[in-house]
């Protein structure tokens, strides 16, 4: 019998009773779209849109439904946190989704670029390291996330010379990759905020693409896996020991670095295998499978890199909402978001990433100004929103 992820109370106010461990569903699966009736996301002007509907579950757990516009594929994934945030460590942490999604996209871009150049790939190993920092005081409002340049190391074997593979790698990352553009450009995020079904005045850039959408609470009541999805898309491969003392992520004053590592390769069946884990602070490792980005040609047996990447943004931002509210002891009974990410995929070396647009729906007893402050601080302390608004250049080397 399949246990559905639903609550015995109102779906907006009872999210604390829903958990990953109470469900028989896998950590990731493709969703049967017949009962969801989501608004289509057509491909306009060559722009690929990815829409994420996300909600909180028990503790630090979260659930997201990700809609990939060009093919209308819908995926459901869940996220958790490790001991650094008193999580239950049952699913990948948010930065794992972002890191794995970036890696999957870059691997696909490398393979496509090699094909265009006639460079043969007999084997491929891909190493990626992402570094994020958190510094400041949550109580004083000075806490902020920042990002360091991503490091990519590629080991490719074939009949061609090493310099050919290096040229392919540099071109794939710096000239072909739409995913990497979200790190390369300075993209300020846009928001709309709704508290208890009441629209609030957001002082920053407006999220016009999502501001008029309906609270996504009911989306999660009609999720069913598509038949035939027997492949385990996400699983834990290594478990970190339980932390001792206070959870470092819940300390009011912080100065720390987060290091996430990914090891990627291509399986014989063509799926991309991604082993991602948190190096500092020490965390568990998860294996995530991904299929190609191509609108034409991909079998969509697993989420694409852009799906995982978009899920990571949503999960990380939601973690910061809950973390800030917990540290500052603000009343927050539940929260959900609808997030749009957009990319222009291109074979002509002119890709593009667009600013993230997010509708935030809060269930709270706090006044309007504090609700706005929760969202403002969540953006300020979100590692991935920091990556979007900070232009960095990815470092590429050949092993």
Regions found by a protein language model. Give the residues of each.
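Alpha-helical metal-binding/catalytic segments enriched in His/Glu/Asp
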Residues: 102-106, 316-317
């Amino acid at each position: 019998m399949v246990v559905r992820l639903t609550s015995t109370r109102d779906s907006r106010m009872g999210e604390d009773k829903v958990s990953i461990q109470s469900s028989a569903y896998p950590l990731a699966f493709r969703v049967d779209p017949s009962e969801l009736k989501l608004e289509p996301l057509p491909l306009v002007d060559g722009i690929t849109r990815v829409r994420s509907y996300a909600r909180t579950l028990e503790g630090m757990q979260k659930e997201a439904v990700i809609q990939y516009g060009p093919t209308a594929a819908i995926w459901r994934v869940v996220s958790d946190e490790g001991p650094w945030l008193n999580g239950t460590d049952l699913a990948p942490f948010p930065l794992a989704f972002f890191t794995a999604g970036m890696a999957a996209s870059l691997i696909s871009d490398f393979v496509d670029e090699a094909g265009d150049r006639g460079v043969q790939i007999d084997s491929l190993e891909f190493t990626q390291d992402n570094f994020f920092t958190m510094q400041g005081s949550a109580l004083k409002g000075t806490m902020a996330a920042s990002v360091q340049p991503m490091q990519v190391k590629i080991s490719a074997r074939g009949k061609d010379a090493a310099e050919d593979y290096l040229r392919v790698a540099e071109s794939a990352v710096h000239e072909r990759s739409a995913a990497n553009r979200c790190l390369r450009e300075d993209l300020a995020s846009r928001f709309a905020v709704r508290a208890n079904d009441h629209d609030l005045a957001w002082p920053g850039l407006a999220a016009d693409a999502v501001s008029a959408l309906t609270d996504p609470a009911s989306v999660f009541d009609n999720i069913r896996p598509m038949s035939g999805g027997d492949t385990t898309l996400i699983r834990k491969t290594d478990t970190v020991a339980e932390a001792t003392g206070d959870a470092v992520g819940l300390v009011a004053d912080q100065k720390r670095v987060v290091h996430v590592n990914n090891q990627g390769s291509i399986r014989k069946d063509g799926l991309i295998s991604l082993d991602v884990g948190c190096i500092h602070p020490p965390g568990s490792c998860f294996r995530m499978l991904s299929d190609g980005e191509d609108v034409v040609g991909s079998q969509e047996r697993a989420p694409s890199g852009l799906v995982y990447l978009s899920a990571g943004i949503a999960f990380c931002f939601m973690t910061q909402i809950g973390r800030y509210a917990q540290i500052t002891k603000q009343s927050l009974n539940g929260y959900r978001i609808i997030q749009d990410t957009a990319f222009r995929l291109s074979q002509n070396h002119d890709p593009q990433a667009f600013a993230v647009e997010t509708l935030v729906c809060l269930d709270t007893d706090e006044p309007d100004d504090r609700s706005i402050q929760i969202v403002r601080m969540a953006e300020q302390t979100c590692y991935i929103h920091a990556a979007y608004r900070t232009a960095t250049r990815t470092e590429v080397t050949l092993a």
